[in-house]
Amino acid sequence: MGNDTGCNGQMHETDIVIIGCGPVGAMLANLLGLHGISTLVLEREAAIYNLPRAVHFDDEVMRLLQTVDLAETTQGLVHVSPGMKFVDDTGRLLLDWARPLERGPQGWYPSYRFHQPEFERVLRNGLARWPSVSLKLRTEVFALEQESDAVVVRYEDLSTGALLKCRAGYVVGCDGARSLVRRLIGAPMEDLGFHERWLVLDAILRRPCSHLGDHSVQHCSRKRPATYVRGTGNRRRWEIAVLPGEDEAAITQPTKVCSNCCSPGSNPRTSSSSA
C-alpha cells in the first residue's frame, strides 16, 4: 500500500479519492488496486469499529471477494445460512424461506452470515497488497470543490490538525448513512418512513444451545415482533420491537431483556420445536 506524502504544502493528485473505509470503501479500493488505479482512501476513525453491525451477505459478495483474491481468507470466517423461518405468536410455522445449501451459478452459496469487524479486517488488510492504494486514517473531509475536469478534496488530519487537499479525477462517497459527500453534492435521500425503535441484543454463547437452531427466525407477533439471527461461531442476535410510548431505559433492564427474549413471541426454542 502506497504512502500519501504529497498533500502537505502542495496539491497531491490521484485518480480516485474514496471517502470512508467501511466494507464498501475497502472493497472498492481493493478492486481499484487490482487494476493499478491510483487511489487515496480517507477514513475518519483510527481503527475498525469493533462491535457487530451487518451480519449477512450473498454469493455476489463472495464473487467480488474471489475477484480480489480474498475469498479463501473470508471462507474461514463465515457461516453458510440455511435460511429463515417465519412463525406466529405460538411458534407455528408460517413460512420456511430455505436457502440452497449447494453452490449456485456464481460459484458460491446464496447466503452467508458474517461478523462485520472480522470482515472489514480482511478487506483492509488486503489493501496492503496494492502499491497504487493509500489509506489515511484519522482524516476528516470538510469540503469538495468541483473543477472542470477534477475535484479538489479538502480534509483535516485529525492527528496533527493539518489542513490538506488532494485533486482527483473522481470522488466516491462511501461514508455511510449520514454521508457528508451526499450532502455536499446535493443528492437527495429517499425517506421510506420506517422510524420504529428496535432493541438489538448481540450475544456470545457461553455453552452450546442447540435448541436455538441454525435458521434465523422472524417472530410475526401481533404484540411484539422480534427477530432471532444465527451468527458466526457462538454469536447470536435478538432484535426486539420497542412499542410506541415504551420507556427505553425500562426495556433495556436485564430482567426485561431476558423476559422479552424468553416470551412466546420471541423464543427460538418454541419456534424451532414447532417448526
Task: List each model region and its residues.
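Conserved FAD-binding catalytic core of PHBH/FMO-like flavoproteins
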Residues: 125-126, 133, 150, 170, ...
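Active-site-adjacent segment of FAD-dependent monooxygenases/related oxidoreductases
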Residues: 53, 58-128, 229-231
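Core beta-strand elements of the Rossmann-like FAD/NAD(P) dinucleotide-binding domain
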Residues: 12-14, 160-170
